[in-house]
């Protein structure tokens, strides 16, 4: 691997979240939650954001915990790719 290729892969952001929708073809909606400290009161508040991520094989289902990685824009709303499954959804 060349030096330029190493720095390119390390610049991509990765996030971990839950799949909340798998209804689209080759796309999943991933909810990423993070805790942020309130600037004035100091209390930790839960913030969340939804990302559309590319799922080439339609293998990830609702409830799965996945890692997504930033990539090139694939559509108007989709520029993230699911890189791996962290934890499968529990079936009740």
Curated annotation (Swiss-Prot):
Gene3D superfamilies: Nucleic acid-binding proteins
InterPro entries linked to this entry: NA-bd_OB-fold, Ribosomal_uS17, Ribosomal_uS17_bact/chlr, Ribosomal_uS17_CS
A GO BP annotation: translation
Keywords: Ribonucleoprotein, Ribosomal protein, RNA-binding, rRNA-binding
Record GO cellular component, one term: cytosolic small ribosomal subunit
Domain of life: Bacteria
Single GO molecular function: rRNA binding
Subunit structure comment from the entry: Part of the 30S ribosomal subunit.
The family this protein is said to belong to: Belongs to the universal ribosomal protein uS17 family.
Primary role: One of the primary rRNA binding proteins, it binds specifically to the 5'-end of 16S ribosomal RNA.
Annotated PANTHER family: 40S RIBOSOMAL PROTEIN S11 FAMILY MEMBER, SMALL RIBOSOMAL SUBUNIT PROTEIN US17M
HAMAP family assigned: Ribosomal_uS17_B
Protein name: Small ribosomal subunit protein uS17
Gene source species: Cupriavidus pinatubonensis (strain JMP 134 / LMG 1197)
Lineage, uppermost ranks: Bacteria, Pseudomonadati, Pseudomonadota, Betaproteobacteria, Burkholderiales
